[in-house]
């Protein structure tokens, strides 16, 4: 990698409207099967079986760690030459593995993760799963989270879209509940207190059912659920749930809302296949995004939000020490995990200048509310609107960074060291995927990640240790 000064690569920021461009760059990202890393921890009674080659196994070992003593709830079904040449019976091999999994771990659900190889050899995982499920009496969910996706975070999207088909239907569940309640009321009709309690329980929620989708740590889901509870909004359930048996009921009349910008496939499945109504809201990343997310849900249910402005102001006041560090600094997003729009919007609100937002894939319909909030934020902060580049070409991005000289580049791991060697501070975008960045209180964690290289540079400058890099960065 080297720098070559070309003025044609520099594009100025726009002032009036968002500018969308599409380049033909390659996708430099993790494989989507890495979603196993956080999903197997979220769904506590699950087991993930990745059907792939040695390369997939090496990747999982490096990405997740060997974990010899932890006995993790995931494994590799390694394809061999006999599988690829159709000399072995795929069904019998998978049956043997799943039977062993049932004997050793007895999970409530087994998730088959398809890979590039299963796509190439046309392995019929969807056809084998129902037969094997009936035979071993354990639900089997098939998700093709292969490397043909745009970003590694879309692996979660694929798994959640597959699980959305397994959610119970709200109408059948409601009918069963009504039958049980009627029978209980007739049985206990001589107890007025019980009858009163039953009526109160029916009148608890005055709005339609609300299901939130997106895999977040349990403490974060509790925080977001509590924030909505303060507005008299009850969350019927989360997709995914901590246990497979606790999947939320969906169907006609159920409202769904996402918490991550890379879940467009799940949103489409819930709308088209399960007939749910999608609430198109900004994502709850940063105090501004969390407030807008809650306000949008409140507006759909006809509820007047209470105390959100004071809550957001309180959080911003607690972040002043970080805001003083980032205010006036510039940042360049190379694009990696589809969180770029939300993070850029939050950093602009913090006072940073965003030159460019590179993103591997852009679903403008699913992220429409987030894009509108980004535009509104830029207008309120009186800053130019950043360029949004879909499928960015990394060579062209390097040239633009050479011209713009940002204070920070948020990039994939592959480009971090070369950019650091040329004097551009970097932050791995994958760290934002695994950090707790949702909700009001976790905004500090975002700024902790963003300011770490800035604070490091400040310390090095005070020690006088940055002269060598600064002197040689343009000649490298």
UniProtKB/Swiss-Prot annotation:
SUPFAM superfamilies: Helical backbone' metal receptor (SSF53807). It catalyses: chlorophyllide a + oxidized 2[4Fe-4S]-[ferredoxin] + 2 ADP + 2 phosphate = protochlorophyllide a + reduced 2[4Fe-4S]-[ferredoxin] + 2 ATP + 2 H2O. Binds 1 [4Fe-4S] cluster per heterodimer. The cluster is bound at the heterodimer interface by residues from both subunits. Pathway: Porphyrin-containing compound metabolism; chlorophyll biosynthesis (light-independent). Disulfide bonds: none annotated. GO terms for biological process: light-independent chlorophyll biosynthetic process; photosynthesis, dark reaction. Its cofactor is [4Fe-4S] cluster. Keywords: 4Fe-4S, ATP-binding, Chlorophyll biosynthesis, Chloroplast, Iron, Iron-sulfur, Metal-binding, Nucleotide-binding, Oxidoreductase, Photosynthesis, Plastid. It comes from the Eukaryota. Its main location: plastid. Protochlorophyllide reductase is composed of three subunits; ChlL, ChlN and ChlB. Forms a heterotetramer of two ChlB and two ChlN subunits. Belongs to the BchN/ChlN family. This is Light-independent protochlorophyllide reductase subunit N. It comes from Staurastrum punctulatum (Green alga).
């Amino acid at each position: 990698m080297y720098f070559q000064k070309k003025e044609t690569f520099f594009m100025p920021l726009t002032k009036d409207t968002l500018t969308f461009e599409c380049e033909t760059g390659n996708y430099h990202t993790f494989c989507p099967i890495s979603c196993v890393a956080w999903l197997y921890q979220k769904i506590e009674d699950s087991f993930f079986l990745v059907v792939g080659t040695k390369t997939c196994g090496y990747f999982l070992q490096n990405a997740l760690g060997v974990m010899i003593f932890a006995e993790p709830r995931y494994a590799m079904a390694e394809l061999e030459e006999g599988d690829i040449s159709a000399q072995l019976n795929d069904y019998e091999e998978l049956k043997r593995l799943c039977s062993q999994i049932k004997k050793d771990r007895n999970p409530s659900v087994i998730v088959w993760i398809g890979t590039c190889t299963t796509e190439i050899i046309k392995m019929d995982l969807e056809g084998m799963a129902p037969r094997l499920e009936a035979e071993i009496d354990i639900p089997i969910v098939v998700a093709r989270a292969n490397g043909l996706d745009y970003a590694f975070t879309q692996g979660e999207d694929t798994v959640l879209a597959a699980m959305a088909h397994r959610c119970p239907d709200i109408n059948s569940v409601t009918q069963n509940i009504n039958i049980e309640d009627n029978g209980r009321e007739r049985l206990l009709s001589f107890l007025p207190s019980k009858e009163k309690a039953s009526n109160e329980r029916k009148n608890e929620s005055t709005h339609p059912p609300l299901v939130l989708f997106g895999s977040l740590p349990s403490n974060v889901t509790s925080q977001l659920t509590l924030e909505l509870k303060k507005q008299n909004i009850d969350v019927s359930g989360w997709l995914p749930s901590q246990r497979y048996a606790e999947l939320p009921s969906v169907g006609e009349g159920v409202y769904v809302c996402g918490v991550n910008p890379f879940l467009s496939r799940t949103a489409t499945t819930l709308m088209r296949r399960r007939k749910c109504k999608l609430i198109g809201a900004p994502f709850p990343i940063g105090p501004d995004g969390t407030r807008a997310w809650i306000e949008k849900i409140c507006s759909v249910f006809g509820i007047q939000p209470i105390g959100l402005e004071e809550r957001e102001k309180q959080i911003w006041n607690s972040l002043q020490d970080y805001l003083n560090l980032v205010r006036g600094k510039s940042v360049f997003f190379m694009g990696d995990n589809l969180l770029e729009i939300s993070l850029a919007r939050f950093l602009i609100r913090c006072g940073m200048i965003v030159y460019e937002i590179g993103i591997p894939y852009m679903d403008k319909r699913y992220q429409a509310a987030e894009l509108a909030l980004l535009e509104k934020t830029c207008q309120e902060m009186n800053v130019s609107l950043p360029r949004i580049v879909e499928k960015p070409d990394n060579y062209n991005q390097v040239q633009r960074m050479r011209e713009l000289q940002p204070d920070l580049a948020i990039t994939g791991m592959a480009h971090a060291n070369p950019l650091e060697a040329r004097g551009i501070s970097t932050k791995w975008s994958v760290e934002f995927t695994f950090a707790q960045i949702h909700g009001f209180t976790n905004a500090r964690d975002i700024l902790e990640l963003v300011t770490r290289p800035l604070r490091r540079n400040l310390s090095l400058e005070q020690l006088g240790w940055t002269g060598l890099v600064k002197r040689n960065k343009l000649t490298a």
